[in-house]
């Protein structure tokens, strides 16, 4: 039995520019300085947004939490502020903020319109350049205030680092409860900070490997019901509609969307025990075989431009990482060091491939360039697995099992800094990161 609850998300938000200055000294100074592991976070002062109720405090708190969690910003203690912002539309006294060494200053206000909507204004100031960097006005329904806060954090992140933000996103994952020998696994989705958790399935079937479309708020995943062959589904997140795209006699492994969202690539177990890669066209349902081998080919992922595929295969004796053209030609092994490699996934920027590596009883999350060079291990532990990229290619998410404990979800910066556990109500595994919601 599958939960039939429909999930509605109305994302309609109107955005206007308040005022945007020309190129600034802060942006010039900060861009290009955040790639090293010894980077010092940017000091930033985020004031409470002026409002007649608590909504302004809440929005400022979410913006602060987003930026602090990125590891690239150091939100300053409000107790240190010399100036109280009562009119966010006027220019601040920059010398007050220079005293506490803030490089950026965020001010804002929230007004309830006569039609019930919220009007949220924010401004980002260059403290030492004495000018405004960014100004935006948002109109939205009251219940969408958290999403507006994430969008503001994205604007600040982008302006002060030169990279795209990733806060206006969601995570789909497997929620796990119950004893280890009778685990209940439910499909769940939440905001990237752990808020707004919703269960998509009820635990009556085994669900595995949820993956987001790179183009839509849509996921694909596997489901196993008792005494039934494996099913592969598409699920529309906004409307809660689920569509069966395939029922397979043998085991199906790790379905994932192509870069244009028009196909799903998956590994199908053969009668001889091997597993080969296939694609399914989502419009015609036609299957195309890409690999023919007596080995196990699995965990395929497309390059951002859709021309190449990376996957894991044990055709050389133990699991290694291979790339090939999207039609299956030009096969190349790219992993060359000791250990077994699995779960490769291409960065949205195309510059790295993330992977899981097993060596000497430890599981690591690492990255390498698409030609296999420049391998770097970001974190190592008892059991780390299943990396997934933020849409800006800056942050990785994965799940970890510690001895005697259930799995939890973690994030880490591509430099290996800023490893953090993501709050979930229960054990959680197999996360997948959505594209930016405001790009849908």
Swiss-Prot record:
Compartments it resides in: Periplasm
InterPro entries: 6-blade_b-propeller_TolB-like (IPR011042), PD40 (IPR011659), Tol-Pal_TolB (IPR014167), TolB_N (IPR007195)
Single GO cellular component term: periplasmic space
Domain of life the protein comes from: Bacteria
GO biological process: cell division; protein import
Coiled coil: none
Ranges where the record places region Disordered: 417-440
Keyword annotations of the record: Cell cycle, Cell division, Periplasm, Signal
UniProt entry tagged with the keyword Isomerase: no
Span of the signal peptide: 1-28
Subunit structure: The Tol-Pal system is composed of five core proteins: the inner membrane proteins TolA, TolQ and TolR, the periplasmic protein TolB and the outer membrane protein Pal. They form a network linking the inner and outer membranes and the peptidoglycan layer.
Function noted in UniProt: Part of the Tol-Pal system, which plays a role in outer membrane invagination during cell division and is important for maintaining outer membrane integrity.
HAMAP family, A to Z: TolB
Family label: Belongs to the TolB family.
Name of the protein in question: Tol-Pal system protein TolB
Gene: tolB
